[in-house]
Amino acid sequence: RLQFSDLFINRKAERKFEKIDTDTYMGEVKFENTIERGTGTAMPRQIERVPRGTTFDFLLIYNIENEEELNEDMEVLAQGFRLLQLDYLGGHGSRGYGRVSFSDFFIERIDIETGDREPLDDLADIMDKAVL
């Protein structure tokens, strides 16, 4: 029922990257160092990461199979987004990496036969209110 598309950096964030000096195409490399306790030997490492505040466009397709379950399904999905915001993606979450947030939901119904589009603002409000 749910189709998750790849997330791509949106145009606004892409223009921001064009104006700043980054280590990679659209990221930065953070150098860290740990010390081996037994030997006192330094163990340098580098982590490539997306800079804080980078925004992505997100497309999720929900195939309506039962109209009566639509609101309940959106509430469950909103709860999942909320839980994801309380956790992290990828590694090093205890250091604050991988934190995400969701905003500016736009939900519409698309009739597959006619192509007609109808905004579903009440469902977008459910999502906006559920996230942090």
Q: How should each PLM-predicted stretch be described?
A:
Residues R1-L132:
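Small/polar/charged residue-enriched interaction surfaces, especially the RNA/DNA-contacting tracks
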